[in-house]
A protein has these predicted regions:
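Basic, short loop/linker segments at the boundary and entry of helix-turn-helix/winged-helix-like folds
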Residues: 35-79, 83-84, 118
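Short hydrophobic/aromatic-enriched beta-strand-loop microsegments
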Residues: 272-280
Length: 350
């Protein structure tokens, strides 16, 4: 028979300021996820760069007008978004819903958070008129890592990974025109249809898998697994075509897979006074010798460390795009490399 005499503990009837403070203290005691970044990163490091990119440093504030949201706060919103692979709408909801997200942003319950449109506009502002904001912010953090002795350039690994864009449903004729660098009729940039079409992304095939989008070509510090440079291209661009743009005289040794092996690449390494550790490959009637195989085996163990970088990026959904166009792809890839470095930096500083 049902026992009506049992009494259970009741939930707190109403929230007050002390309940909220107690909840905040409980959350702050456990530092995990994105909040580990705030333990090791001084966000004010980016303020001057952000204000310069956005033109705030040159703006005449005496003319009035609605003041913008703090650019450092907006930058942290983008970091939060990339770290968790969120869309603009999802990011807005999660900032309102999750206390840990508000804590990361330095906000309190009840305070206004940037909406999806504001997030979109801020990303656009970083890249507008060739500002290349994501690149400049990446370089600012890379400079801090170098000055802190975390990037030694004793050995660098060069490799590339696909970043898939939303697939297009075009006719064969339209695809042929796009491949020739032309915009098909009705695909004008300002038209309703044109705004949904990516005429910059390209198809590529690797290991029997088809990819549509772009490539993230990176140079990674072999010891710390930090990205030191990157280049964005269409997916059909061969890895070897950007080798010279990534490798410079600052690198003491360079490791890469056999896709980068060419006389041009080796000449560039000689010009930069870099040790050559590009994987060797055999040819018809000229197979690899036992010594060559032994050399490849030794370097491949180190070169494989770059796959850990791409693996972590994939976990954070950085290997796919929600937008169209190369300019936005470049922003996504630049910010992805930056946020990966922040995550890696937090791991190294444990």
């Amino acid at each position: 028979m049902y026992n009506t005499t049992v009494r259970y503990r009741e939930a707190t009837p109403q929230l007050d300021v002390f309940s909220l403070l107690s909840h905040e203290q409980a959350v702050t005691q456990v530092v995990k996820g994105i909040n580990k970044l705030s333990k090791v990163i001084d966000w004010e490091l980016f303020r001057e760069e952000l204000e310069s990119i956005l033109g705030y440093a040159q703006r005449d504030w005496s003319k009035g007008g609605r003041p913008p949201i703090d650019p450092v706060l907006m930058f942290k919103v983008l970091v939060l978004q990339k770290f968790h692979g969120l869309s603009d709408e999802e990011c807005e909801f999660q900032m309102r819903d999750r206390f840990s997200f508000m804590m990361f942003l330095g906000l309190h319950p009840g305070e206004a958070v940037p909406d999806a449109r504001t997030i979109w506009d801020f990303k656009q502002a970083l890249e507008r008129d060739g500002r290349d904001g994501a690149r400049k912010l990446f370089e600012r953090f890379e400079q801090m890592l170098t000055e802190g002795g975390l990037i030694g350039r004793k050995g660098s690994i060069v490799d590339a990974s696909f970043v898939d864009a939303p697939r297009q449903r075009n006719s064969r004729k339209e695809n042929e025109q796009i491949k020739e660098g032309e915009r098909p009729e009705g695909f004008e940039e300002r038209s309703a249809k044109g705004r949904q079409k990516d005429c910059d992304a390209r198809w590529a095939k690797k290991n029997k898998e088809m990819h549509f989008g772009y490539k993230n070509h990176v140079k990674v510090d072999a010891k710390k697994k930090l990205v030191t440079d990157y280049k964005t291209t269409e997916a059909n661009v061969h890895d070897s075509q950007v080798f010279k743009e990534l490798v410079d005289e600052k690198d003491e040794a360079v490791l890469a897979d056999s896709a980068y092996l060419s006389e041009e690449a080796r000449e560039h390494l000689l010009e930069c006074n870099c040790e050559d550790f590009i994987q060797l490959k055999g040819y018809r009637n000229h197979p690899l010798s036992e010594e060559d195989k032994k050399t490849n085996k030794g370097t491949s163990r180190i070169r494989a460390r770059v796959e850990h970088v791409f693996g972590r990026m994939s976990q954070m959904a950085m290997d796919r795009l929600r937008t169209i166009g190369k300019e936005r792809a470049n922003h996504h890839i630049g910010l992805s490399n930056l946020v990966y470095n922040m995550d890696r930096f937090a791991f190294l500083m444990r």
